[in-house]
UniProtKB/Swiss-Prot annotation:
Its main location: cytoplasm. Disulfide bonds: none annotated. Keywords: Activator, Cytoplasm, DNA-binding, Phosphoprotein, Repressor, Transcription, Transcription regulation, Two-component regulatory system. InterPro entries: CheY-like_superfamily, OmpR/PhoB-type_DNA-bd, Sig_transdc_resp-reg_C-effctor, Sig_transdc_resp-reg_receiver, WalR-like, WH-like_DNA-bd_sf. Phosphorylated by YvrG. Residues 131-230 bind DNA. One of its GO terms (molecular function) is phosphorelay response regulator activity. This is Transcriptional regulatory protein YvrH. Coiled coil: none annotated.
Length: 237
């Protein structure tokens, strides 16, 4: 995990240097940095980046715009770093493809812990992925190959959404709370952060459901959480 490539994108050099120092103390050696979103795009194109820490408010292209472009080349987890902390801002960030949201001012040790937890979860998911392919009426999912086929066509999906889908597939017909999903998929306590789970489930529904507004596979259990139904309405794969 210490061999992971981490890209830090922020126009404040002091913040970049602080994050790099903390990550280096944690044992990470492959740390890249960029001073702008425009500078970050070619770095992502030229390197296999495992995780990106991306500032939202920078001169020129914003982090939101950069995230959308990065998603064309990479499914690496993206942690937004920003002073904008409203729920609306967080929802906007998750909507464009972010995986986590760190509010300034922040504790660099907490950021390092979140990065480690996320990378650990990603590597564990890859190591434990079996050869099993989950085949349902409308989509097929291969965790080992990170491949999602919906309606006969390959669908691009971020690593975080694939981990979320894998967790649901591994727990069919079980009611899962938002806190439970967050802790298992993101790798650390949710502290009541339900928006993260809700937005990612909405995005996952947009990928796998025939009608995301009337989901068949990932259904809401009011007051409790969500249930994954592998064969809606008695359908058999």
């Amino acid at each position: 995990m210490e061999n992971a490539s981490i890209l830090i994108v922020d126009d404040e050099k002091a913040i970049v240097d602080m994050i790099k120092r903390v990550l280096e103390k944690e044992g990470y050696r492959n740390i890249l940095d960029a001073a702008s979103a425009e500078e970050a795009i070619p770095v992502v194109k030229a390197n296999k980046v495992d995780l990106i820490v991306l500032d939202v408010m920078m001169g020129g292209m914003s982090g939101f715009e950069a995230c959308t472009l990065i998603r064309e080349y990479s499914d690496a987890p993206i942690f937004f770093l920003t002073a904008r902390s409203s729920d609306a801002d967080k929802l906007s960030g998750f909507a464009v493809g972010a995986d986590d949201y760190i509010t300034k001012p922040f504790n660099p040790l907490e950021l390092a812990a979140r990065i480690r937890a996320h990378l650990k979860r990603t590597y564990q998911s890859k190591e434990t992925s079996s050869n099993q392919t989950y085949t349902y009426d409308y989509f097929t999912f291969s965790p080992q190959n990170a491949e999602l086929i919906v309606g006969g066509e390959a669908v691009a999906c971020s690593a975080q959404l694939l981990q979320l889908l894998q967790y649901f597939c591994e727990h069919p017909n079980v009611v899962l709370s938002k806190d439970q999903i967050y802790e298992k998929v993101w790798g650390y306590p949710s502290y009541g952060d339900n928006n993260t789970v809700m937005v990612h489930i909405r995005k996952l529904r947009e990928k796998i459901e025939r009608d995301p507004s009337n989901p068949e596979y990932i259904v809401t259990v009011r007051g409790l959480g969500y249930r994954f139904i592998p064969n809606p309405e008695g359908k058999r794969s």
